[in-house]
Structures are given as C-alpha cells and as structure tokens.
Amino acid sequence: MLKLSSSQPDFAERLKALLAFETAQDPAVDAAVASICADVHHRGDAALVEHTNRFDRMQAAGMADLTLSREQLEAAWLRLPADVRDALSAAAERVRRYHEKQLAHSWSYEDEDGTLLGQQVTPLDRVGIYVPGGKAAYPSSVLMNALPAKVAGVGEIIMVVPTPGGERNDLVLAAAYIAGVDKVFTVGGAQAVAALAYGTETVPQVDKITGPGNAYVAAAKRRVFGVVGIDMVAGPSEILVICDGATDPDWVAMDLFSQAEHDEIAQAILLCPSADYIAQVEASIAKLLPSMPRRAIIEASLAGRGALIQVSDLAEACEISNYIAPEHLELSVADPDALLPQLRHAGAIFMGRFTSESLGDYCAGPNHVLPTSRTARFASPLGVYDFQKRSSLIRVSQAGAQKLGRIASLLAHGEGLTAHARAAELRLEDGTPR
C-alpha cells in the first residue's frame, strides 16, 4: 500500500496520479451497448427477452416470465426470517424519515403591482430504478433509490433487476415490496436501461433512471441521457479517513476495507498527522486482511489505489480532502464539528469515531448514492430533489404589464428581436413602442 507524506517535494504530483481514474469509455463496450439499445428501441419486448436469455442464461418465452407481481414481492418478504424483516423495516423507516426533510414545496409572492411570481414543485410521473442482481444482491440500493422517489410523490416506480440463471434474491424483492415499488421486471444490463428509456410493449417508458450497474449499464445510461434523465454515472467506490491518531487502528483498517472490498479499483485513503499511528494502521491491515472473505479484492484495491498519507496537521488534512472530494469522508477525530467548516467537497461526511461508513450504506438515513471520482466538487447525493422538478410561475397584472413591458421592449430592441418587443408593447396602455 502506497505511503506518502505531504512534505514530499513531489506530493502534489503523486496525489494527482493516485486519484487519476480512466473514465474514458471502452469502445468495445460502447459498440455493444449501442447495438443492444438500438435493438430494444426498434423491436421492444422481443429484443428485451432475447438479450435477457442470452446474457442472463434464462429461458423466458416472453415478458410474462420476466415480470413479478406485488404478490410475488410480498411472498419474498414473508419468506425472510423475522429478524431480517425487522432490520429491513428499520432501515426503510430511517431512510424515509430522513428524506422527508428534503421535500421541496411550491411557493409564490406578489409584487406591489399585483404581479405573482413563484415556483411550482411537482414530482416526476414515472421513474426506473436499476438494481444489481444475482450474487451481487443489494437490498439497500432498492431502499436508497425507491424511497426518495416515493417521498417525492412519483406516480409510478419501475424496478429492473437481473436474475442470472433465474436466481432471485428474496432480500432485494422484499425491499422492493416495503419501499412501494409498483412494477418489477427481472431484466438487467444495457437492454434493461434501453427498455426503461424507450419503453416496450410491456415496460413503460420512464422519465428518469437511477441506480448502479456495471460498465454496460453505465454506458447505456450515458447513451440514453437526454431521452430520459439519469442520476449519475458512478465510478469506483471511495473512502477517505481523516484521523487524529486516537482511534483504534483496527477500526480504521476495517473502514478502509469496507470500500476496498467493493472492487479492485475502489479507493481507500487515510490522512493522519502521526507516523506512528499510520504504522499501527498498517499493522492492523496486515493482521486483519487474512480473515476477510474478499481478501484478494481488498489487496488489489489497496495495492493499486490505496494510500496512507502523513500530513502536518488536521487543517492540512482538510485541504487535501477538499482536493480529493471523496465519495465517503470519515472524520475519526475527537472534535469533528471543529473540522466541518473547513470541508467543502464530500459526498457524505461521517462524524466521530463511532460513525463507520457502513452505517451510512445501510441504515443511518442519508442516501448512499453519492458522487465519485472528484465529482463531489459539483454534485450531491441522490435525494428527493432528484425526483422533483420545478416550474417558474409568472402572472403579470395589468399594472405590472405597463412597467415590465417597457423594460422588456427596450431590452428586446437592443437584442434585435422585434417580435419580442412588440409582444410586450401591444400590452401597454397606449400600445406604442418605447
């Protein structure tokens, strides 16, 4: 695992190299996705069934074999052990309660001349959520995508989830049940994204697609953006831990593992002023790694993109963190509130030694769909606001038309747009150009 010090003359260059991630699209993936999307666009259900059978080793005769009813979702819920149902319910309630705080409302006000100005907030009509399936089963992704949409008041939530070899995951289906998903189709990959974006005879066209997926799903989301909205095209998972050197090093090592185990190209970084503590964390990593079921993935991630970085103090750690703009930022320090004003760019900030990132992944309440690859500089977590849209409201009174008409007329003539000017002038009491 790479060890750096901010005092090194070449630190800035080495940090930049560490953060570099090749986001360019793979031409082979692009070509395959373009072909699949075009096929689903033109042939609808037939193409969707064909590609699903091919890629997911299915033998579906038609879309009826790839459609799950609410009764089937409920049955999956009832098959779960009681303690798992309780855990899923508790997580769902916390996620719902948090997102209810984000709900935006319409507003308006009147000028002194009676002109009304405002904003009308409305939910999207229909959204599609993509959930990974098969062995990579993520019920938490169902909750994090469906519940904000539900809170926003979205009219219909469509979920797609691949079931390779016909393998359905009860946890995922149960999460869809308690989150209020309206329709579930057991399809995945680029073909599922295309079906949601363009619609087929069975799959309704949606207004927005959210949720994580592999390179083919990401490429398909890029391709259909503009036809529908998308949440983001996410890169590898990331965690940055700022530690003052007083947290149990085993805790920090395991927190680094928690993201490294996602993917060989996930990123885990520690910033700490103490060289001795960094050595302790390094020892904890060596001690704990052999017991991890996903050891090979963690090792590859830490070796390829991980780092233990010594900084001069916590203030410098915050400066470096703002440059990194991590997906997950842990403040494993005595007084996290003191650091908060110095931090501008992070998807989610986990404050205090007891706040492990994994709690945010499952049940704390805030969304775990977060900006990656330094996009936290300008992007935000998925939320209710992603499932609402805003329309401006303008109702000009007769008196207001006299004042605004003259302003608009002058500006429109200045831009050489005569019809714009005349449309305003005709509403003036004397109807004359100004």
Swiss-Prot record:
Protein name (Swiss-Prot/TrEMBL): Histidinol dehydrogenase
EC number: 1.1.1.23
Source organism of the structure: Chromobacterium violaceum (strain ATCC 12472 / DSM 30191 / JCM 1249 / CCUG 213 / NBRC 12614 / NCIMB 9131 / NCTC 9757 / MK)
NCBIfam families in the record: hisD
Cofactor: Zn(2+)
GO CC list: cytosol
Residues of the active site: 327 (proton acceptor), 328 (proton acceptor)
Residues where Zn(2+) binds: 259, 262, 361, 420
Binding site for substrate: 237, 259, 262, 328, 361, 415, 420
Binding-site residues for NAD(+), renumbered to this chain: 130, 191, 214
Annotated GO biological process: L-histidine biosynthetic process
UniProt cofactor note: Binds 1 zinc ion per subunit.
